[in-house]
Regions:
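ASCE RecA-like P-loop NTPase motor cores
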Residues: 1-180
Length: 180
C-alpha cells in the first residue's frame, strides 16, 4: 500500500486529486474522519488508499456519488502460513482443491467485499477495476458475479480512456433518457 500510495503522490494524480491513505491501527475518530472525506464532495476528486480486507472493505455505506469506483490491486491471497497450509493439506487429502480453499476463496472473498462498497443502492453507478492479470484466469473469473461478465481488459495505456468513455457514455445515456 505504501509503495502504491508513494507512486500516486509522485504522479499527476496528486496534482488533480486529493489523496488519502489508511493508516495502521486507525482509531474510531480517524476512521470516521477518513470516511467523512468521501461524503464531503469538495469538488476535487478524492482517491483513498486502503488495505484489501481491512476495516474499510466491509460494513461501510458510501452511497450516491460518495464512492464511484474502486481499484483493487491483487487477488487478495492470504499470506502463506501454517494455518493455511493445514487447510490446504486437509482439502488435498479429501481430493478437493486445497489451494482454492486455503488461498483463492478467502482472497476472492476480500475482493468481492471491497468491490461491493461501490454499488450499495439501485441508483448507484460506479466502476470496479481489478488490477492483476490473474483476474483473467478462468479459475478466478468463475468466482466473480455473473453481472461482471461484461468487462474490458485494459492496460496502463488505455485505462484512462476506457474510464472516460464509460462516464461520458453514462452521461449521454442520462441525456437520452431525459429527452425521451
Amino acid at each position: 500500500l505504501t509503495s502504491v500510495y508513494g507512486m500516486a503522490e509522485q504522479s499527476n494524480l496528486a496534482l488533480v486529486s486529493e489523496l488519502i491513505v489508511q493508516e495502521p491501527s486507525m482509531e474510531e475518530r480517524s476512521r470516521e474522519a477518513f470516511l467523512e472525506k468521501f461524503r464531503e464532495q469538495s469538488g476535487k476528486p478524492l482517491i483513498g488508499f486502503c488495505v484489501l480486507g481491512s476495516i474499510f472493505s466491509e460494513g461501510i455505506d458510501l452511497t450516491g456519488n460518495s464512492l464511484i469506483g474502486v481499484l483493487i490491486v491483487g487477488t487478495g491471497l492470504p499470506q502463506i502460513c501454517n494455518e493455511r497450509e493445514v487447510i490446504r493439506a486437509y482439502f488435498d487429502r479429501q481430493q478437493k482443491k486445497g489451494y482454492d480453499y486455503a488461498y483463492r476463496y478467502p482472497g476472492m472473498n476480500k475482493v468481492l467485499q471491497a468491490a461491493g462498497r461501490v454499488i450499495r443502492t439501485a441508483e448507484d453507478v460506479g466502476t470496479i477495476l481489478l488490477m492483476d492479470e490473474r483476474f483473467l484466469e478462468r479459475d478466478n473469473q468463475s468466482l466473480l458475479p455473473e453481472e461482471w461478465e461484461s468487462y474490458y481488459a485494459v492496460n496502463r495505456n488505455n485505462c484512462g480512456q476506457v474510464l472516460e468513455n464509460f462516464w461520458n457514455g453514462l452521461d449521454n445515456d442520462k441525456v437520452a433518457e431525459a429527452e425521451s
